[in-house]
């Protein structure tokens, strides 16, 4: 007898091959049998007639490290069909960190990760993974946080890793890889990551390469103080060449400013591949992104960590210098920022900085810094979408063209904090699998599922997931290919998709007729 029998569905197995009609039997946390099972018994039978049965989606880039620890149900991801997430992105995470450094990092990252419990053990990758294993609704994978390594080696300071400090970081990284990390994640536009040198990264990536892991990088592309040229791509390629590590580029896509220029975006990556660097990429299917307001401050302000930052924000002379620097930041202009997460001022969530500044009779620079002080740095924002509908449509089409490449995968870059988060937190996967697939008809549904499931599983070494196959874990999403669609918008972002009635995680029904069941069956993987 099976624990669960999925009857009458059409299976898309994730490998890219043509769909086929079949039943599927589950025992425990694994797929036991695929075939004609109409005469078989099961404790639970799910009628999937007229529906697609596919592997659960794997979110290749999510910022849920903190949120999952305060909201383990994680409906915003689960209702999209996401069964596994790669955490630790952009080097912005919590392990390995001592108690004191975790406390500091917890506050520093509160605008992007929220505030997880203060008493957690984050001293190693093993300890980090234990905080999630069978305690949250989805599976989690973790690349070692570059920011955490730097904090443990030299504190929150603009100091290069050399000699003993570099060896200490390499030792922590090696231990993390042995404890199940899938690689090393850096955010070269964020701190303390941005203070690293290319040589430091090459040495760290030699450790990752030896362990078979992946170098996951958000490039040095939006930090005006530490730019590299070429959007940071040449640095990542150089690291791949000299260390032998596999390179994964985070959210690589066009925007309203360069819509349609796909070849221009990928030229340096493709040249790196020709030169022998193993590269993959990922994106989210929206024209603008979101992050935490603290990250927009100039590099020197971050020196010393959160308490020192707040001191600088309050000092009149230093404050003026910061505001002058913010006025020059064209990558994240304050006038385009919609504040999405303000725990102490929720009445202003969903409003732009200029709108709030007008209400408070302040300049936009003063308003931004005052909000950081009032919120103890816990401020999130997203950039306003383009008003040019043609540019928006072109960016959406570009996303599908990018994703038609076999080296691409999908990652939400989700930050589900506040009352008005970026809509990608609730809509990324049904937008890709449903809305944009139907609108642009660039890929078959089989190819779409491969990008959403098997590609990230293969890239990050997540074994026995990403496909519907006997002996694989029963991470499964059942959906209507004609109805699946996102409903989250910039104006009304906390809206769940439709057309996804069932989601299973490790053989447990986690979404049942579009309702989350409250089962925490997620594993720390691989």
Spans of features found by a protein language model:
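Histidine-rich, glycine-flanked metal-binding segment
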Residues: 1-7, 11-56
